[in-house]
């Protein structure tokens, strides 16, 4: 059901090659000295790339987004996010990373979140967390994310994480980190995931491997 809702609310053809969008008439802050800023300017997007920034851009075949009275600027980049934990964002606010042996730190991130809450996640829970986390970040102006994904308890969990990240419609890097349990296929499932979801490096969602593969035992 969440997938159906996502498909029905995102703009048609989002990020697809050849789809042109003109953001028109906004106050453009390019953050690039070579491009400059415009009190009233336009931004032309072709597929997933910005191809022109300037005043009075002619692009008659484009979908037009009227930006008069608004600021147009590059989105923020989040370099480290665990999107599968979106619904847990208020949990363990005062916890430390790992158990240091002190009684007051018995409730720590690794044991409580990764070894506790995440173990009962179903694939549909992963998808909803990924999708909602992505949409919420878009609403806050974050248009690119490095998703440190540690929820690979089964191939179905992995698929749900990727599809939720992708379906939010923004640029994202899927970080394939660990999972636990008898059905976990980490890291050997990486070949299937790469072939099924990341056959091209020139797409909105791309893949990197997690650092655990360099730890003895993997």
What residue spans do the PLM features occupy?
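Histidine-rich, glycine-flanked metal-binding segment
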Residues: 4-21, 27-74
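Metal-coordinating catalytic core of metallo-dependent amide/deamination hydrolases
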Residues: 12, 151-218
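Short coil/turn connectors at secondary-structure junctions
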Residues: 17-19, 60-62, 68, 140-143, ...
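Divalent metal-coordination and catalytic microenvironments
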Residues: 26, 43, 48, 69, ...
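Histidine-centered catalytic micro-motifs
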Residues: 75-86
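Active-site gating loops and adjacent loop-to-helix segments of metal-dependent hydrolytic enzymes
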Residues: 87-126, 169
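Hydrophobic alpha-helical hairpins/lids featuring a short glycine-rich hinge
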Residues: 115-150
């Amino acid at each position: 059901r969440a997938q159906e809702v996502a498909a029905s609310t995102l703009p048609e053809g989002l990020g697809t090659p050849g789809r042109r969008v003109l953001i028109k008439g906004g106050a453009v802050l390019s953050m690039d000295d070579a491009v400059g800023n415009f009190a009233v300017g336009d931004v032309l997007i072709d597929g997933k790339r910005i191809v022109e920034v300037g005043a009075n851009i002619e692009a008659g075949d484009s979908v037009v987004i009227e930006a008069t009275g608004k600021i147009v600027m590059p989105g923020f980049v989040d370099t480290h996010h665990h999107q599968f934990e979106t619904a847990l964002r208020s949990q363990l606010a005062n916890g430390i990373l790992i158990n240091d042996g002190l009684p007051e730190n018995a409730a720590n991130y690794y044991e409580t979140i990764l070894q506790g809450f995440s173990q009962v996640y179903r694939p549909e829970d992963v998808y909803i967390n990924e999708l909602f986390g992505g949409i919420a970040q878009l609403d806050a102006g974050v248009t690119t994310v490095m998703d440190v994904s540690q929820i690979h308890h089964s191939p179905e969990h992995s698929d749900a994480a990727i599809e939720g990240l992708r379906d939010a419609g923004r640029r994202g890097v899927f970080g394939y980190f660990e999972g636990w349990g008898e059905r976990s296929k980490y890291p050997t499932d990486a070949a299937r995931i790469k072939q099924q979801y990341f056959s091209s490096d020139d797409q909105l969602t791309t893949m990197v491997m997690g650092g655990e593969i360099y730890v003895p035992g993997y």
